[in-house]
From Swiss-Prot:
<dbReference type="InterPro" id="IPR027304">
    <property type="entry name" value="Trigger_fact/SurA_dom_sf"/>
</dbReference>
<dbReference type="InterPro" id="IPR036611">
    <property type="entry name" value="Trigger_fac_ribosome-bd_sf"/>
</dbReference>
<dbReference type="GO" id="GO:0015031">
    <property type="term" value="P:protein transport"/>
</dbReference>
<dbReference type="GO" id="GO:0043022">
    <property type="term" value="F:ribosome binding"/>
</dbReference>
<dbReference type="InterPro" id="IPR005215">
    <property type="entry name" value="Trig_fac"/>
</dbReference>
<comment type="similarity">
    <text>Belongs to the FKBP-type PPIase family. Tig subfamily.</text>
</comment>
<feature type="domain" description="PPIase FKBP-type">
    <location>
        <begin position="163"/>
        <end position="248"/>
    </location>
</feature>
<dbReference type="Pfam" id="PF00254">
    <property type="entry name" value="FKBP_C"/>
</dbReference>
<dbReference type="InterPro" id="IPR008880">
    <property type="entry name" value="Trigger_fac_C"/>
</dbReference>
<keyword id="KW-0143">Chaperone</keyword>
<dbReference type="GO" id="GO:0003755">
    <property type="term" value="F:peptidyl-prolyl cis-trans isomerase activity"/>
</dbReference>
<comment type="function">
    <text>Involved in protein export. Acts as a chaperone by maintaining the newly synthesized protein in an open conformation. Functions as a peptidyl-prolyl cis-trans isomerase.</text>
</comment>
<keyword id="KW-0413">Isomerase</keyword>
<dbReference type="GO" id="GO:0044183">
    <property type="term" value="F:protein folding chaperone"/>
</dbReference>
<keyword id="KW-0131">Cell cycle</keyword>
<keyword id="KW-0697">Rotamase</keyword>
<dbReference type="GO" id="GO:0051083">
    <property type="term" value="P:'de novo' cotranslational protein folding"/>
</dbReference>
Length: 437
């Protein structure tokens, strides 16, 4: 048997194998003999059909069986002898198997790249300086009050103002022809919120109950109905009712509706604590992504396409799960599976690169995980909930593979922490960070 191993790229090898004719003949004979024993052909007792008839009837089955055995006995033996570890099923190309002729085939095998970390300390990155803005808490409280507002009918001869909630009938027409898909009755609109068309809402200001008017607008190119998107047309609007929002008072009674709070000050304190933690977590996650990207840029690495494909499919499934939990679909987001795959391919490639580089760093620095660190991770995941803590422990001790996944996650966090501790970090103000983005 002749074997040739060729390196195609850092992540792929081509294995070419030629099996001599005498070995091919031997396997063909043995296979036909086996088929002859079990073949059931009309007019012949089992095992008594002539060999020539067996060959004519079962030639394709013979070829499939012989080639399968050759792959099993020669390909995997060759891979083992040359210490080639495939990370996906090999892609095989072969000649036609014929008696009296050597059988040649080749297998393209994807392998893990050799990861050489040339620079992983002194990585230069930026970090957003956290600055607490109390106004964000007040803005959130204002949104909470707005969400609990009561709608009170406006009495008397009153015209629509910004902020009013109005009930309207409207019908849209283009060039005098009605578009039923862009019409509604008793639609509720918050004037000035611009949840519909700003140009449309602004022209409602000044209308009074019972009044009708024409409102001319140009629909945006991205309008939900493609048949009228980008066209100029007219709405015939009839105003049925005007209501105003009556906000609840900002007092202790208001605060008590949001959990175990006795006063507005307690509510503010908890919201401030949550906001600060949320912002710090966000900055930490951004730092993590930034330092991994810096690691990728300093350590170029080819990655197997099969790993990228798996990462893309995982990202697609994660998105579908999130959309399903919100009763949404890919179509509602204006995309399909293929367009999403194309959109995330580059980021999926970087995720694979980053993962391989972190694995190499973990091995190089010999990071380990203690039982105490595992317990701390359990507690972090439980968030102080004792019942949840027990369920988490039960889950991660249910099998060695599940426990291993947690240990791998902790090791990866340690590797990222190592990168950050040894990086050159320049702090920037939030405004500068936003401008760079």
């Amino acid at each position: 048997m002749q074997v040739n191993v060729e390196t195609i790229s850092p992540v792929s090898k081509k294995v070419s194998i030629e099996i001599p004719a005498d070995q091919v003949n031997s396997e063909i004979e043995k296979t036909y003999a086996t088929i002859q024993k079990r073949a059931k052909i009309q007019g012949f007792r089992p095992g008594k059909a002539p060999l020539q008839l067996i060959k004519r009837t079962y030639a394709d089955s013979m070829r499939d069986e012989v080639m399968r055995r050759f792959y099993e006995t020669t390909l995997f033996k060759t891979l083992a002898e040359h210490k080639i570890e495939p990370i996906d099923a090999p892609t095989v190309e072969c000649d036609i198997l014929e008696e009296g002729t050597p059988f040649k085939y080749s297998a393209l095998v994807e392998v893990m790249p050799e990861v050489l970390l040339t620079q992983y300390t002194g990585l230069e990155i930026t970090k957003e300086r956290y600055v607490f803005d109390p106004q964000k808490i007040e803005d959130e409280i204002a949104r909470m009050r707005d969400g609990m507002a009561q709608l009170v009918p406006v009495e008397g001869d009153v015209a629509v103002e910004m902020g009013h909630m109005v009930t309207i009938d409207y019908a849209f027409s283009v060039d005098g022809f009605p578009e039923e898909s862009t019409s509604a009755e008793n639609a509720v609109v918050e004037v000035g919120a611009h949840r519909l068309l700003p140009e449309f809402e602004d022209q409602l200001v000044g209308m009074k109950c019972g009044e009708s008017k024409h409102v001319t607008v140009t629909l945006p190119e991205a309008y939900r109905n493609p048949e009228v998107a980008g066209k100029e047309g007219a709405f015939m609007v009839t105003l049925n009712e005007i209501k105003r929002k009556e906000l609840p008072e900002l007092n202790d009674e208001f605060a008590q509706q949001f959990g175990e709070f006795e006063t507005v000050e307690q509510l503010r304190e908890k919201m401030t604590e949550y906001h600060q933690q949320h912002e710090q977590d966000r900055i930490e996650q951004e730092q993590r992504e930034t330092v991994i990207q810096a690691l990728i840029e300093k350590n170029p690495l080819d990655v197997p396409q099969s790993m990228v494909k798996r990462q893309v499919e995982q990202m697609l499934q994660n998105l579908k799960n999130r959309l399903k939990s919100r009763n949404m679909s890919m179509e509602m987001m204006g995309m399909d599976d293929d367009s999403f795959r194309e959109r995330v391919r580059d980021s999926a490639t970087d995720k694979v690169r980053g993962g391989l580089l972190l694995m190499a760093l973990i091995e190089k620095e010999d990071f380990s995980v203690s039982d105490e660190e595992i317990e701390k991770r359990y507690e972090k995941l439980a968030g102080g909930n004792e019942e949840m803590l027990e369920r988490i422990k039960e889950h991660y001790t249910s099998s060695p593979s599940v426990r291993h996944s947690l240990i791998a996650e902790i090791k990866e966090d340690k590797a990222v922490r190592f990168l950050l501790d040894n990086a050159v970090i320049t702090e920037t103000d939030p405004a500068e960070t936003a401008a760079e983005a």
